[in-house]
């Protein structure tokens, strides 16, 4: 049995902890936020401000179920997703997706899902240390220094350190300093976002089984998303630039009222008023893309989830890939018979290529959703028609594969590229 310290007790960190604890390891999770089971903890408050309604696709579901979490309990955290709808020119264009497996994607309550993971982590004897902010990581000594809410500073050592501490990862920063030829790339998207919540979804009059997208008729001004979760609330993510007459910095109520009246005209006036009030009151959040050339350091440390490969949420795969990271790590323990020296480099080799592919697709999707693209729907319709008419020759529907399978991201990116070629040929013909 090894002592393993995981920095970060979010979704990726908690699922990883479950997998490792099931193998008999002594797992300790250090989390800067409070206990998610405490209603008034800072964890819940911060998540409610930043979470863009989380969509769990089949790859994420399989990663959770393989950790021994019952499907019926996971289902209680979300609502089944059967398709997506785009609001353009005052009308909805709805696309139902055809299930390819017995499982269905879920629109999750992030806080409920976090509590579910913590529940099973504790059942598997994972030790959580809340209110512990990581100050420094010593990779060669496999130790970290943390500071609790009372200001007490302590040092903790382990046999393996895992960084699941998000986009501003302490563990990754230590790797940047200590890893020879470590390459790190970061850029901010021109848009940030605010999360607005309507407590009673019945007011909104949107289908609970659809994910909604807004802004494709805005000429690149903004991109929006909406989804309903089991508690009956609907979460709206409004992504806008940081500068301009209409932006995340706009404080003119009349200007933003016109914005919501134009692009959310299908909502009741009282609902639009609630969105406006929240928009003017809530802080904005950044969208950032992170690429790391290596995910491990010697036999001492590993990074996964957003710490390794954060990106914009416009493909809906950030959380799903993070959960799949935990599952892959578990399979590598079997493949290499617990040999850390072999499995950590293999994790980097496999996951780096897949993360790059996922990020490439997310960035491409962001460009489509945040820019004026009048041929988007024509192209989507053409793709579905061709894949059904000529299944042996034309690439399959990428959206259905993305939501309903665990197909490798690198394969999905190849499908996307082939569809681009076929579409160009179709236009020429």
Regions found by a protein language model. Name each.
Residues 1-4, 22-23:
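Extreme N-terminal leader/targeting segments of oxidoreductases
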Residues 141-284, 291, 296:
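Conserved FAD-binding catalytic core of PHBH/FMO-like flavoproteins
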Residues 12, 16, 35, 168:
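Conserved Rossmann-like nucleotide-cofactor binding loop
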Residues 21-49:
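Glycine-rich FAD pyrophosphate-binding loop
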């Amino acid at each position: 049995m090894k002592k393993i310290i995981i920095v970060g007790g979010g979704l990726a960190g908690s699922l990883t902890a479950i997998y490792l604890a099931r193998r008999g390891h002594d797992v300790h999770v250090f989390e800067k936020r409070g206990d998610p089971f405490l209603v008034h903890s800072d964890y819940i408050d911060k998540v409610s401000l930043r979470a863009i309604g989380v969509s769990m696709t089949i790859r994420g579901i399989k990663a959770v179920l393989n950790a021994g979490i019952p499907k019926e309990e996971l289902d209680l955290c979300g609502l089944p997703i059967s398709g997506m709808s785009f609001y353009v020119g005052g009308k909805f264009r709805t696309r139902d997706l055809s299930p390819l497996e017995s499982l269905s994607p879920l629109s999750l309550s992030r806080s409920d899902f976090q509590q579910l993971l913590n529940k099973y982590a504790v059942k598997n004897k994972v030790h959580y240390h809340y209110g512990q902010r990581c100050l420094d990581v010593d990779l060669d000594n496999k130790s970290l220094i943390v500071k609790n809410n009372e200001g007490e500073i302590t040092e903790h050592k382990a046999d393996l350190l895992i960084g699941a501490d998000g986009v501003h990862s302490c563990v990754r920063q230590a790797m940047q300093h200590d890893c020879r030829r470590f390459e790190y790339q970061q850029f901010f998207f021109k848009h940030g976002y605010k999360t607005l919540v309507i407590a009673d979804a019945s007011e909104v009059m949107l289908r609970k089984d659809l994910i909604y997208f807004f802004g494709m008729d805005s000429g690149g001004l903004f991109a929006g998303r909406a989804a309903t979760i089991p508690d009956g609330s609907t979460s709206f993510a409004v992504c806008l630039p940081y500068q301009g007459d209409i932006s995340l910095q706009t404080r003119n109520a009349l200007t933003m009222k016109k914005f919501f009246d134009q692009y959310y005209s299908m909502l009741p006036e009282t609902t639009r008023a609630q969105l406006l009030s929240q928009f003017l009151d809530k802080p904005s959040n950044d969208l950032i893309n992170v690429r790391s050339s290596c995910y491990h350091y010697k036999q001492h440390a590993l990074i996964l989830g957003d710490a390794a490969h954060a990106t914009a949420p416009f493909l809906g795969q950030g959380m799903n890939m993070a959960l799949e990271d935990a599952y892959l790590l578990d399979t590598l323990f079997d493949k290499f018979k617990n040999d850390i020296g072999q499995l950590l480099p293999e994790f980097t080799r496999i996951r780096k290529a897949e993360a790059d592919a996922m990020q490439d697709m997310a960035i491409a999707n962001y460009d489509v959703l945040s820019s004026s693209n009048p041929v988007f729907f024509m192209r989507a319709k053409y793709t579905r028609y061709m894949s059904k008419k000529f299944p042996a020759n034309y690439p399959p529907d990428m959206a259905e594969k993305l939501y309903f399978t665990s197909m490798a991201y690198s394969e999905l990116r190849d499908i996307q590229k082939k569809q681009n070629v076929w579409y160009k040929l179709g236009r020429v013909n």
